[in-house]
Amino acid sequence: MPKQDKEQYLINNLGSKYVGDDAAVVGDTLYSMDAFFEDTHFKREWMSIAQIGRKAMLINISDAIAMNAQPKFALITVSLPHDVTEDQIDELMTSMDNTAKEYGCEIIGGDTIGGDKLHLSITIVSQSDTPLLRTGLKEGDLLAYTGVLGGSKRDLDALYRGEKIADDSRFFDPTLRADFVAKARPLLRTGMDISDGLFCDTNKMLDINKYGFHEFEKVDDEIGLSGEEFEMLVSFAPEHYSDVMQIAEETNTPLTVYAKVAKNDDRYTCKSHHF
């Protein structure tokens, strides 16, 4: 069974009404958790300890941002290999703590275990009165993505070839669109962050809403199959196009409208981006 099918099979078996978004919404509180595992999401020889800590925190905060929520608290589980030094542990925790504070989030506890590899799992508790969900699409809605996609996959391929990439690479340090999401929220119908690639995440949104799409122009595989971008995939009604684009300009957020929602079964061909 392909990775995406196994993931959906597990989710379906949970049987909870709270499952299906970037975070579980319980009242005005949102709960989310993401793993960041060595040799699945990163290789230690590719990144400094500080970069590992920062990205682990960013990809978790991204779930809150994607749902128009304010991150409040973080709980961290870390599996520490025997070769990690105390100085490296300090560097890891300082990086995560500083990154969390950038978004108004406080680390309040967690757990540590010994292991063969460096694994991190972070739970974020956030709050929102108007969460942005994946559900709610309507026929004719426009589908758009923020940022310039493709850089994460391009740099990942370079790392595989043994090349160096820039310290500010999206693969190391993704950009979260908190200002855009907060200001555009009244006009947005649905949203999610792009973690598995534009193609796969578009399919997820269409599947949960039982719609298809019409593409305005072909999206290249280099863009659509680039995972771990952590940009936003959003939808909105056509009549809000000008206002949404104005907010994108005001928040310095590149925004590309690439498709519209339709009553068909069309889907992108996609695959997992993990190793």
Regions found by a protein language model. Give the residues of each.
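Helix-biased detector of long, well-ordered alpha-helical tracts
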Residues: 1-275
